[in-house]
């Protein structure tokens, strides 16, 4: 089992965790339906970049 040789400081711990923060999701509005959706994802209606991608 790995055991640290010296105590890590609060500063080093914080620097290591600096990339752990959650980022907000970017939301776009579809040109055709006006529906909001995540970037680079198909809307619930099946539209992506103004075109029908999925037939229901």
Curated annotation (Swiss-Prot):
GO CC terms: large ribosomal subunit
Coiled-coil boundaries: none
Pfam family, one: Ribosomal_L32p
Key word Ribosomal protein present: yes
Family matches, as InterPro entries: Ribosomal_bL32, Ribosomal_bL32_bact, Ribosomal_zn-bd
GO biological process: translation
Keyword annotations: Ribonucleoprotein, Ribosomal protein
Molecular function (Gene Ontology), one example: structural constituent of ribosome
NCBIfam families documented for this protein: rpmF_bact (TIGR01031)
Assigned protein family: Belongs to the bacterial ribosomal protein bL32 family.
Protein known as: Large ribosomal subunit protein bL32
Native species: Blochmanniella pennsylvanica (strain BPEN)
